[in-house]
């Protein structure tokens, strides 16, 4: 029954929501959600919901849908500005390209993220 529900849910999703669930959610969950979530919103930003990414954090909104080069998230994950996230090395270029594509296409959300 659970598999049937998931199959029906996948059919009802928009392509943008499917892209988020399959490509973006794993990146945000693995790279961001541990420190930036509802309970621990380091830097004033939580990655567990779209609204938080759109509102002003300590450095402004994390994303500007349709405008990846104006999105603070991309600057941070590329390690180009003052804030370098996640700590350590920048994200792999493949992940940065996926995030850029997601933002360029409107940064639509899919299923709720869980850490």
Tell me the role of every PLM-derived stretch.
Residues 1-8:
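Sec-dependent signal peptide recognition
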Residues 11-115:
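Aromatic- and Gly/Pro-enriched helix-to-coil junctions and flexible linker segments
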């Amino acid at each position: 029954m659970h598999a049937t529900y998931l199959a029906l849910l996948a059919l009802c999703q928009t392509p943008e929501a499917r892209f988020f669930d399959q490509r973006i959610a794993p990146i945000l969950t693995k790279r961001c959600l541990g420190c930036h979530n509802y309970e621990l919103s380091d830097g004033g930003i939580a990655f567990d919901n779209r609204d938080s990414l759109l509102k002003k954090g300590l450095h402004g909104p994390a994303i500007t849908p349709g405008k990846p080069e104006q999105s603070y998230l991309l600057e941070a994950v590329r390690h180009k500005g003052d804030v370098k996230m996640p700590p350590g090395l920048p994200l792999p270029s493949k992940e940065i390209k996926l995030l850029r594509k997601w933002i360029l296409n409107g940064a639509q959300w899919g299923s709720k993220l869980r850490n």
